[in-house]
């Protein structure tokens, strides 16, 4: 009971307690449903669809709402190619506005945001190992999707956090881990048009 009370007190100290609560819930609910949803959903297809929808909601919430509110960062994929600094992303960061006079990033918001953002793909990766050991290949497909989606979000925010907008591209190009690029992938990219939907959020 004390731990619940302490957690509640921590959330209350947040600059955006509602957003922080939604952010943490967005990470926890897909995991909880993956572990317990089989007791309530009898069809595998329904279980997969619901889990994927929960992961998509978490992706959108983190990328377009909680990231902007809690750590003042936002990113989206550059659909036209890579930038001059070698990054495949376009960024918005508090670092772009040195004259900003609003509230600074709350340490509690920042800590819980980054812990949950990095913990999510790590936890899904652990589930993936368990699926391999148990030969649960249908679940493995779902877990790999979850690890990829949450990991992609974590990678985008990590890159945005390390981005220095005031430096020249030649000074920052070395910090970006290069994403693999292939020729003639236009048709493949069309399969992932959900990125365009999220980008405009």
Curated annotation (Swiss-Prot):
This is Golgi apparatus membrane protein TVP23. The chain crosses the membrane at residues 18-37, 43-61, 112-132, 137-157. Pfam families: DUF846. The keyword Protease does not apply. It is found in: Golgi apparatus membrane. It is a multi-pass membrane protein. Golgi membrane protein involved in vesicular trafficking. Belongs to the TVP23 family. Keywords: Glycoprotein, Golgi apparatus, Membrane, Transmembrane, Transmembrane helix. The gene is TVP23. It comes from Eremothecium gossypii (strain ATCC 10895 / CBS 109.51 / FGSC 9923 / NRRL Y-1056). Glycans are attached at residues 64, 78. GO terms for biological process: protein secretion; vesicle-mediated transport.
């Amino acid at each position: 009971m004390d731990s619940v009370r302490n957690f509640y007190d921590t959330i209350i100290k947040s600059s955006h307690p509602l957003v922080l609560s939604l952010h943490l819930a967005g990470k926890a609910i897909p995991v909880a449903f993956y572990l317990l949803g089989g007791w309530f959903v009898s069809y595998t297809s329904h279980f997969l669809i619901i889990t994927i929808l929960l992961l998509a909601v978490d992706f959108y919430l983190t990328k377009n709402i909680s990231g902007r509110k809690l750590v003042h960062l936002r990113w989206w994929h550059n659909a036209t190619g890579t930038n001059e600094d070698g990054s495949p992303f376009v960024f918005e960061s508090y670092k772009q506005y040195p004259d900003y006079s609003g509230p600074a990033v709350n340490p509690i918001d920042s800590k819980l945001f980054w812990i949950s953002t990095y913990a999510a793909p790590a936890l899904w990766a652990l589930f993936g190992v368990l699926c391999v050991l148990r030969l649960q290949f249908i679940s493995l497909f779902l877990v790999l999707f979850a690890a990829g989606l949450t990991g992609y979000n974590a990678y985008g925010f990590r890159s945005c956090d390390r981005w220095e907008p005031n430096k020249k591209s030649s000074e920052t190009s070395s910090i970006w881990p290069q994403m693999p690029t292939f020729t003639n992938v236009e048709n493949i990219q069309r399969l992932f048009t959900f990125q365009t939907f999220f980008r405009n959020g």
